[in-house]
């Protein structure tokens, strides 16, 4: 069985405020100073700022990821508010990316948030994903999941995938460039009923 390793990111120094902020991480042997420095140096692309992307972005910000790209083309709707916890009532009608950026920076002003207020397509997927170390797929449809997977495979980027359906959830890390399968390896064909 192949061993999956961490993405290669250069450690960076932490300020005194960051040492205090991340002190609970720093005392964990699995993270420590080196791990926290790698988190700060990491560039993560979060595709989707909805029901799954919202908590993903919040936890990544709280954990201290240094740069987070947020991809979404939609605006906040009242029907989003009960599950898309990164948005508030005051955000209704605003772009999800802008709402997400403000909440992320309210939680952790040290995170550089890069907004991609677009729909991910076959024309822009490679350019969107290329600058990042790892992709977090918080999308809610199969065509976008396959597109994200294919771009990550081509660019040799780890793809952290998650999905939610009612009270069930799935999560996986796909890194075929490190010897594991990809999303398309597990689900080679999409049924017409799911498109």
Q: What spans do the regions from the language model cover?
A:
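Adenine nucleotide-associated cytosolic modules
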Residues: 1-192
């Amino acid at each position: 069985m192949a061993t999956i390793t961490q993405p290669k990111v250069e450690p960076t120094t932490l300020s005194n405020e960051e040492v205090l902020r991340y002190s609970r991480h720093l005392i964990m042997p699995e993270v420590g100073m080196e791990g926290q420095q790698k988190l700060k140096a990491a560039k993560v692309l979060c595709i989707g700022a909805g029901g799954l992307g919202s908590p993903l972005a919040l936890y990544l910000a709280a954990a201290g990821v240094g740069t987070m790209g947020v991809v979404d083309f939609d605006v906040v709707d009242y029907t989003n508010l009960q599950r898309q916890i990164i948005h508030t009532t005051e955000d209704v009608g605003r772009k999800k990316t802008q709402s997400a950026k403000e909440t992320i920076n309210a939680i952790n002003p040290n995170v550089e948030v890069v907004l991609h207020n677009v729909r991910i397509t076959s024309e822009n997927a490679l350019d969107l994903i290329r600058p990042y170390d790892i992709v977090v797929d918080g999308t809610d449809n199969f065509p976008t999941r396959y597109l994200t997977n294919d771009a990550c495979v081509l660019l040799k980027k780890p793809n952290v995938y998650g999905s939610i359906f009612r009270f069930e959830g799935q999560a996986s890390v796909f890194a075929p460039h490190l010897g594991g399968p990809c999303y398309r390896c597990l689900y080679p064909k999409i049924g017409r009923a799911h498109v």
